[in-house]
Curated annotation (Swiss-Prot):
It holds the Pfam family Spy1. Residues 66-80 have a biased composition (Acidic residues). Belongs to the Speedy/Ringo family. This is Speedy protein E13. The lineage of its organism: Eukaryota, Metazoa, Chordata, Craniata, Vertebrata. InterPro entries: Speedy. GO terms for molecular function: protein kinase binding. Residues 1-80 are annotated as: Disordered.
Length: 265
């Protein structure tokens, strides 16, 4: 009887935690592990015993912080208006780089210089002391027209020089009388025999004498040639001042560029 009471007393005494065998749950895992994973008691008031978890939310917070760090850089970036200015500057640099990539090839300068040796053209330039029909800008337009017409350089002849010069005067000059002299120099009329008569006078004199009829036919033929030359340039007769200066800059020491009306006394 005493032995039985002793065993009962021993069974009610608390055993140390180390000697307790973990009880199995219905799932087959220790109850202690399940409790430890699910319930964690606070070790001290106001202290969170759980370690910080780097979850997806933490990554997003970090990305937000990184983006917030980049925001000052975005504020320092140039505004769209400044970007447009930069693009405009790049455009100007491209122009400077291209130098408008002048379509006037060296062969057209060579054709122009070759025609300057023509005796009739020399006589016209020597006669035009006041530079009323052949100043430096009008002569530069001749080179531009040669380029736009697109003929091979060796095909340009005296008639093309006079057609281009006449068309340049049509574009830039308002006085018709000096321009008529270009036509008469083309047909090798001397200055003393140049009748500064209007087209109406030629029409009235058409049937009066053979010379008048010849002049009328020459004027009609010249105008026909001028129209074809104008069409060969695709009707682009206007030349900008910038392009004229670029043409002169190709050979700035050329003697024809000294024919400046501003230098006349």
């Amino acid at each position: 009887m005493g032995q039985i009471l002793g065993k009962i007393m021993m069974s009610h005494q608390p055993q140390p935690q180390e000697e307790r065998s973990p009880q199995r749950s219905t799932s087959g895992y220790p109850l202690q592990e399940v409790v430890d994973d699910e319930v964690l008691g606070p070790s001290a008031p106001g202290v969170d015993p759980s370690p910080p978890r780097r979850s997806l939310g933490w990554k997003r917070k970090r990305e937000c912080l990184d983006e917030s760090d980049d925001e000052p850089e975005k504020e320092l970036a140039p505004e769209p208006e400044e970007t447009w200015v930069a693009e405009t500057l790049c455009g100007l640099k491209m122009k400077a780089k291209r130098r408008r990539v002048s379509l006037v090839l060296p062969e057209y300068y060579e054709a122009f210089n070759r025609l300057l040796e023509d005796p009739v053209i020399k006589r016209l330039l020597a006669w035009d002391k006041d530079l009323r029909v052949s100043d430096k800008y009008l002569l530069a337009m001749v080179i531009a027209y040669f380029s736009r017409a697109g003929l091979p350089s060796w095909q340009y002849q005296r008639i093309h020089f006079f057609l281009a010069l006449y068309l340049a005067n049509d574009m830039e000059e308002d006085d018709e009388a000096p321009k008529q002299n270009i036509f008469y120099f083309l047909y090798e009329e001397t200055r003393s025999h140049i009748p500064l008569l209007s087209e109406l006078w030629f029409q009235l004199c058409r049937y009066m004498n053979p010379r008048a009829r010849k002049n009328c036919s020459q004027i009609a033929l010249f105008r026909k040639y001028r129209f074809h030359f104008f069409c060969s340039m695709r009707c682009r007769a206007w030349v900008s001042l910038e392009e004229l200066e670029e043409i002169q800059a190709y050979d700035p020491e050329h003697w024809v560029w000294a024919r400046d009306r501003a230098h006349l006394s």
